[in-house]
């Protein structure tokens, strides 16, 4: 399965936040939307990504205030991303190698989606369940 196919299934909604926004605002959005990361953008420019992990390590463990800390201060600036043509296996390999959980999807210079490790696993398990069901039907003569 490709990233494009996954985005068509789950929708291409990408929640973003400005680098100047507070970490508190970022965490509020993540909690409200039940997501683990936000893409940090300035206009149409991808600036970074901020995750729950960034919050835990760079704010909580350092005793900083989420209301006084900007996303720019703790975001991961070196963002790994994929294009819609990539396969989910390629995404999982990249996430595993780089020890990350979210990949923005870029097409023609524009942010068109985000893929999480959970999205990949759900899609792959669903495909495997379908294959198993088909094989069981075949074995039963159906």
Region roles according to the model:
Residues 17-34, 81-99, 106:
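The conserved cystathionine-beta-synthase
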